[in-house]
Each structure stands twice: as structure tokens, then as C-alpha cells.
Regions:
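Glycine-rich FAD pyrophosphate-binding loop
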Residues: 42-65
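Helical element adjacent to the flavin cofactor pocket in flavoenzyme catalytic cores
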Residues: 159-228, 232-233, 239, 421, ...
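Flavin-dependent oxidoreductases
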Residues: 36, 196-318
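Dinucleotide-binding Rossmann-like beta1-alpha1 core, especially the glycine-rich loop
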Residues: 69-149, 155, 286-287, 296, ...
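C-terminal catalytic lobe of FAD-dependent flavoproteins
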Residues: 329, 334-437
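Short beta-strand to alpha-helix junction loop
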Residues: 79-89, 113-122, 160-181, 188, ...
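Beta1/beta-strand and adjacent pyrophosphate-binding region of the FAD-binding site
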Residues: 19-33, 51
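Glycine-rich active-site loop/strand segments that organize a redox cofactor
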Residues: 60-90, 100-105, 306-343
């Protein structure tokens, strides 16, 4: 995919900021959801001015660039829920968008495999759920049919989802940004938002008074003035909300997922995505086999508490991030309910042999000599004060002048990458209704 045409402006370009510091809407966060939302808004309202403010020097650096790359079909989610609707819509929009833009993807399918008899009723219930969600081409298949698709996979029965695919979501995110810029939007990187408040006076270059009454400052003291703000801050959504005087709830607790990778000479053993039957007692899906666009195969991930919000390595540590997490009562309530599974995840994170044992339930031929440690990602898990994982989308604003001009996307849970274009349409509608665009 051609991505060299994307032009971003760093906040250190003071000439740009002096000449172009006022916008109708500023979107905080240059990940998939922020970029898709900004793109949707500028396409709907080409006469208005929009900016994306991203704290990193590049776009899609964190969750958007550290995910599994799966285009989910919408099987897992409660029928009628927002997640289910947005995933099914989003998958179709994602494929259509990739076709239009020439972004490579592979519709390699997914098998959800029951390896024990007790998992079969749950697998059948998952099939019924998928049908209710209108997932395309879903079917239950026998062990023989499963092995025709995945010759090295073992199991009693599988749920076959041929509509599931894979893509490089960073390419998708950069394409959103390119669309946004071509439509007149501005992308400001290296702009870490540290303050939002009502402006006491108009910007120096303005001849329109306080038409843009909200001032957004970054860590360097540079300013952008706008009428409205949409925040899609991912791992920092709670802190960005607090900056504007809005509620810190729900809190973000970071969970790191470590992947293993199959050695290149062993990748022939996996053709499509292979997933376990989810256990309703545990909050995450469990280890799985994920082919990648570059031909590699990722295994995992686990799910362990990260000691830093952008902590991609085992010993990455931030006193503030760690303190915020361990002092939050909601985390301790979550831990107390999932102590055994949490300890198992920590054990598997430290010992490859424990992860391999889980993988061998599906592909017995995989050995510890076939794998290497791979990349990691950090998931922004929203958690309420009772220790419940917030499983759906959360939007809020605040009170007073500034709160009425801000829409915070507090939680955009997995599969937000798959659903990003559908989420963007929902956010754009919310912005139009709240702010009267």
C-alpha cells in the first residue's frame, strides 16, 4: 500500500500554529477510532475546519499499531448490543474500504475449536449467537471438516467463520489520515494535550473574537483554539477526561498481551485463525493462532497487568501508571474474583512451556523449539469501581461551558479496529446531535 503521500505537521512547526490555530472541531487521538471519526466528520461537513491532535510523532502508534490484525465477524457479542451491530457493520465497511483503497487483506477465515466435550454446548450456543448477530456464512463443522481446512488442528467440533479476515491496521489508519487531509483536515503530531479550558481572549491572529472559545494546550505550551472537542485517547481516555474537568470514571487499567511467533519454517501448520471456545468465567478470549499479512503466525496473547500504560516489555515501569492502577479499588475487586486465572496468566507470561502446553491442545505438533518470543500490545481496559470490565461504548461530556463542548469517547472496546468505520458514523452522529453541526 502507498502511504508516502500522508503529510503531517508537527506541533514544533510554530509558523503553522501561528497561521492555523483555530478549528471548528479538534479530535484528540490519532489512532483508528480518532482518525476514522475525524475522516467521517470532515466528509460530512466539508465547509468546517477539523484537526487531529496526536501526542506521538507518528500516527497509530499504540493500540492501533499493536493489535492482532484480525477483521472480526461479530460472533462473540450479545445479540442486539452495540458491539454486535457495530462489528458486523464494521467488518463489511472495512472490506469495502480496503477494496476501494487497494489495501491488501486476506479473508482467511477463523475456526473456533472445541477440544473437550464440555465445550461443545458452549460452541453451539456461540453459533446461535452468531446467527442472531447476522454473521455471514457461519456454520458448525465436524472434526473431519475442520481438518480439511486446518490439517494440523485437532478438536471435536468447530465453528467455521469464513468471513473473518486479517489486515495491517496501521495501513488502514494511515489511509484514514490521508482521506482526512485530502478533504481539508489537519493532522498535528507531537502534540500532547495537557490542558483544556475556556479561552479568556481570542487567539492573536483571530479577527472573529471568541468564535473558537476552547483553548487546548500541549506540553510545550503551544495552543489550538476550537469550538468543540472530541477525544479518542485510548490508553489515556480517563486522564484526558480529567484534564477537561470531566469524570475520571471509568478508569483505564492497562493489560499487556505478549505474543509468541512460529518460526518461519513452521508457519505452514496454520492457514487461518484458530481460536479456543471462550470460557465465560474469564474476561479474555484465551490463546489463539493468528496468521499475519507478512506471512508470519502469532500465537497468544496472554493478558497480564502492565506496569506502564505504554509498557510493551515485562519490566517497563511507570510509578504514576502503576500507582493509579494498584490504588484503584476496582482493580482489587477484579483481581479477587479472578485470582486463579490471573496467576495462571502471569505464570504463562514467564514460562514458554506453559503457553506451549495450551497451544498443543489445538496443534499437538507445536513444540517449544518451534516458537520465539514476539511483540506485545497493551489493551486499554476500562474498569468501573466495582471491578467490572466495561464491555460497551461509553460517551460522556461534562458540566459547565467547557463540558458542554466536549465529547469524550471513554471506552471503545475490542473489536474497535474492525468496527472503526461504523464507530465513526456513530460518533459523527453523536457530535452532530450534541453540538448542532
Amino acid at each position: 500500500m502507498e502511504i508516502s503521500r500522508l503529510v503531517v505537521v508537527t506541533s514544533s512547526d510554530t509558523i503553522f500554529l501561528l497561521l492555523n490555530s483555530t478549528f471548528n472541531v479538534a479530535v484528540v487521538g490519532g489512532g483508528l477510532v480518532g482518525l476514522a471519526s475525524a475522516r467521517e466528520l470532515v466528509l460530512r461537513h466539508p465547509s468546517l475546519t477539523f484537526a487531529v491532535l496526536e501526542k506521538e510523532k507518528e500516527l497509530a502508534c499504540h493500540q492501533s499499531g499493536h493489535n492482532s490484525g484480525v477483521i472480526h465477524s461479530g460472533i462473540y457479542y450479545t445479540p442486539g448490543s452495540l458491539k454486535a451491530k457495530l462489528c458486523v457493520q464494521g467488518a463489511a465497511l472495512c472490506y469495502e474500504y480496503c477494496d476501494q483503497k487497494g489495501i491488501p487483506y486476506k479473508q482467511c477465515g477463523k475456526l473456533i475449536v472445541a477440544v473437550e466435550q464440555e465445550e461443545i454446548p458452549r460452541l453451539k450456543a456461540l453459533y446461535e449467537r452468531g446467527l442472531q448477530n447476522n454473521v455471514r456464512d457461519l456454520r458448525l463443522i465436524s472434526a473431519k471438516e475442520m481438518q480439511a481446512k486446518e490439517p494440523f488442528c485437532r478438536g471435536l467440533m468447530a465453528l467455521d467463520s469464513p468471513y473473518t479476515g486479517i489486515v495491517n491496521y496501521r495501513h488502514v489508519a494511515l489511509s484514514y489520515a490521508e482521506d482526512f487531509q485530502k478533504a481539508g483536515g489537519r493532522v498535528l503530531t507531537d502534540f500532547e494535550v495537557t490542558n483544556m479550558e475556556m479561552a479568556k481572549e481570542s487567539p492573536p491572529e483571530s479577527t472573529e473574537g471568541l468564535k473558537h472559545p476552547v483553548v487546548v494546550r500541549n506540553s510545550k505550551g503551544e495552543e489550538v483554539y476550537c469550538q468543540h472537542i472530541v477525544t479518542c485517547a485510548g490508553l489515556y481516555s480517563d486522564r484526558v477526561s480529567q484534564i477537561s474537568g470531566c469524570s475520571p470514571e471509568p478508569r483505564i487499567v492497562p493489560f499487556r498481551g505478549d505474543y509468541l511467533v512460529l518460526k518461519p519454517e513452521k508457519c505452514y501448520m496454520v492457514k487461518g485463525n484458530i481460536y479456543p471456545v471462550p470460557d465465560p468465567r474469564f474476561p479474555f478470549l484465551g490463546v489463539h493462532f493468528t496468521p499475519r499479512m507478512d506471512g508470519s503466525v502469532w500465537l497468544g496473547p496472554n493478558a497480564v497487568l502492565a506496569f506502564k500504560r505504554e509498557g510493551y516489555k515485562l519490566f517497563d515501569f511507570s510509578p504514576k501508571d502503576f500507582g493509579d492502577a494498584v490504588l484503584y479499588s476496582g482493580l482489587w475487586k477484579l483481581v479477587s474474583r479472578n485470582l486463579s486465572s490471573g496467576m495462571n496468566e502471569m505464570y504463562r507470561a514467564c514460562f514458554l512451556s506453559a503457553q506451549v502446553k495450551q497451544l498443543q491442545k489445538f496443534i499437538p505438533e507445536v513444540t517449544i523449539n518451534d516458537i520465539l518470543r514476539g511483540p506485545s500490545g497493551v489493551r486499554a481496559q476500562a474498569l468501573d469501581s466495582e471491578g467490572n470490565l466495561v464491555d460497551d461504548f461509553v460517551f460522556d461530556g461534562g458540566t459547565g461551558d467547557i463540558g458542554s463542548r466536549i465529547l469524550h469517547v471513554r471506552n471503545a472496546p475490542s473489536p474497535a479496529a474492525t468496527s472503526s468505520l461504523a464507530i465513526a458514523k456513530m460518533i459523527a452522529k453523536e457530535v452532530e446531535e450534541r453540538f448542532g453541526l
